Amino acid sequence: MVDMKKRDAGKTIQEKANVLWDVANSLAGLYKPHEYGLVILPMAVVKRFHDCLLPTYAKVQKEFQAKKHLQVREAFLRKASGYNFYNTSKFTFETLLADAKNIGSNFRDYLNGFSDNVRDVLEQMKFEDQIATMEKGGVLYQVVSDFNSAKADMSPEKVATNDMGYIFENLVARFSESYDEQAGAHFTSRDIIYLMCDILTVFGTGRKGASKTVYDMTMGTSQMLTCMEDRLKEVDASVEVTNFGQEFNPFTFGIAKADMLIRGGNPDNMRYGNTLSDDKFSGFKFDYVISNPPFGIDWKVEAKAVEKEAALGDEGRFGVGLPSKSDGQMLFMLNGISKLKDDGRMAIIQNGSSLFSGDAGSGPSEIRRHIIENDWLEAIIQLPNDSFYNTGLKLCLQMHIAMCRLMHWRVSRFRFLYSSSFKGMNIEIMMPYIVAFRLRECMELKCL
């Protein structure tokens, strides 16, 4: 099982997030409190890239000068940097601060030195707009200086990849809180993420050294994908994991793509767009789906596209039925089910309304009937109240399978676990229940 120390972002992570958010002191007056994240989030991404690349700065500069005459030099520069990204600018944060008068033009030169995949991330976050604002307001030099402090060191030696993900989520949560976002825009605690990962992998990964795919339809900063990959590799160190995710928030999407670049994955698998109306993974099937989609948020904007796809029946994702336009969470559930391989498994967070909303024969009722009659529901776990930032709703973790390995004898047995009193939930707490269910099923199998 996962080391409990890995599950706790820890005091150091909180302190690092505090240091980065304290840059707001340099922004006060020029920016309103709910706008601080527009600067702090992309600057944190830039500084993380900078600190990762700093040890190979001289090597990249040498390689860049040697290969300047070549039209195609990407591979050489990536090899020199040690990452799937690089920066060819002559500047570092340290040398930027040596010329306060030209901080604006020099900082832009530094950002333009990044490889295209990094510049795409920054463009998605509209960072150039904030550079212009800071330059005009006279705070750009101070902000760069703040991020260059020893306490803001985000090199891999100081901040591990997973810990950096926790820091990013902490910053996003503060940004969201300052915006006073809707209850459906929530963030998932590590305990719940690891519970989901542990239950998804409770039966192992199958053949040793297998290749597994993981998909999150509302990935946020992609921490569910990261945790799931780590969990799979703890179960089988030789497993090959490929992550896929879609996100509609440009800031969290930028962070997710940056995280994937730093981890050495394929950033093209992180795709920007509205999952309901613009499915970027149409036709894809995955081994695992893990997600905490928004709930209590209407889908009126996506209605035209969703209804058009629903009219396709079995050829689309939503042919079974449509929920009320006031809450689109069941649409995400249907999307997830449509993305499962025959032996795939999904863990998805829903609030209680998906269990009882709608009269008999209504869209929600037909969705539930479709899932139950196909025996795709494996378990429902009620989570503690106040499990999520910015919402006090009662929530459930639903486990779905497309086709259990034991489908030939497993007949319509889904489980409901009541865990509203659990604090700090994890697989150690849940395992006795899971083992009991497995033992019961094994006994039933012998009797058949």
Report the location of each language-model feature:
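Non-catalytic, mostly N-terminal accessory regions of nucleic-acid modification and defense proteins
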Residues: 1-204, 269-277, 382-385, 414, ...
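A conserved structural/catalytic subdomain of Rossmann-like adenosyl-cofactor enzymes
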Residues: 2-7, 11, 279, 283-448
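Soluble or luminal CAZymes and related metallo-dependent hydrolases
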Residues: 15, 19, 248, 328
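Short, flexible loop/turn elements at secondary-structure junctions
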Residues: 45, 221, 247-250, 387, ...
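A generic secondary-structure signal for well-formed alpha-helical elements
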Residues: 47-60, 175, 232, 264, ...
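A short, mixed-charge helix-start or loop-turn motif at secondary-structure junctions
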Residues: 178, 238-239, 317-319
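Conserved S-adenosyl-L-methionine
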Residues: 183-291, 295-307, 330, 351-353, ...
